[in-house]
Amino acid sequence: MGSASSKTRKDKAKSSTIAACPTDTAAAKACPTRLDDGLAQVAMFAGLRQVTMGVLRIDYDYQTNLGDILDPRSFDFRLVSATVEGLTFKRAQEGEPLPCYVMSNLDGAVKKLIDAGADFIVGDCGFLVYWQVYVRDFAQQYAGGRACPVMLSSLVLSLPLLATIPVGGKIGILTASKGSLMKMQKKLASVIELQKEEARTRAVPAAVQPSGIEINFSDPRFKVVGLDTVNSFKTALADDSGVDDRRSIAIEIAKYCKQVACEDPAICAWLIECTEAGGFSWAIKLGTGLPVWDPVTIGRFLSLGFTSSLPSVALTLGETGQVALDPNETDVSKGRPTKAEHRFGPEFEEMLQ
């Protein structure tokens, strides 16, 4: 790369929130800057700030594992969380109106996440979908004009995913308790209506449109599959001390899902509702050979809206922003341009100041 342009980028990177390392391999190894996660690799090129995911937690403690939405190892970006005191798993599962003090705690938890810099908010329990509308609109109001997308449950993905399956296909919705999830079908509409009325008193017009959570589990394109019969998983959920070896659980869940898919070959994808089952999505993929979406998928999906486009596009442009990336002039093994014509153009440098 040209030395003048390289120096300019380095000077500007120094003033960014995340320091940049030299881009050549030898210098990068010697660079003392600590790169906390994969996003910092993007920041090396673009000087972008780190994205932050806010996790709204119910009042329930459990041992996190790789693949859980509360485990920092599940993501390559920053994670902050806030617990809604009084919103127990039982209350979340029932979906009944919350006591005033719990609603106040819910407001406080959302504020805490936004104040901590959360770019978007997800939940650690699928039953938080009952409060999807309320939290979505309250967060937007409190954020004061700053976009803060909210997706509290992987169930919000159920309708968009229907567009991806072929005619006659089904999405298997995996949940810890089939009975509890089916009850949601009857309650969700009335709960949403109550939240809309509450939100109107707060002068949040967006609450009139409860988009994204009108879920109909009686739709023949959905097949609700409960993990009630997977004994090792039920034991793990009930064990407050956690589970040290999850391999036996993963194998049992994978075998169970494979059996269900064999009995109903119309299933062509899985959507995991239960947050604690999300850590076994890899086993379900291997066992069934089908794509799997889970609570972690939500976090990664929303994060891309804040991190992906600028670096990948800008790095393919030259000084004027018009020169396309020539594969023959690129070190593919390192995944980064090596020629001077692939520098950031001045218009992009100005954007990153």
UniProtKB/Swiss-Prot annotation:
Its EC number is 4.4.1.3. Coiled coil: none annotated. Residues 331-346 have a biased composition (Basic and acidic residues). Keywords: Lyase. One of its GO terms (molecular function) is dimethylpropiothetin dethiomethylase activity. Residues 326-353 are annotated as: Disordered. The keyword Lyase applies. It is an enzyme of class 4 (lyase). It catalyses: S,S-dimethyl-beta-propiothetin = acrylate + dimethyl sulfide + H(+). Induction: Expressed at low level. The active site is at C125 (proton donor/acceptor), C274 (proton donor/acceptor). Mediates cleavage of dimethylsulfoniopropionate (DMSP) into dimethyl sulfide (DMS) and acrylate. DMS is the principal form by which sulfur is transported from oceans to the atmosphere and is a key component of the ocean sulfur cycle. Homotetramer. Belongs to the aspartate/glutamate racemases family. ALMA1 subfamily. This is Dimethylsulfoniopropionate lyase 2. It comes from Emiliania huxleyi. The lineage of its organism: Eukaryota, Haptista, Haptophyta, Prymnesiophyceae, Isochrysidales. The gene is ALMA2.
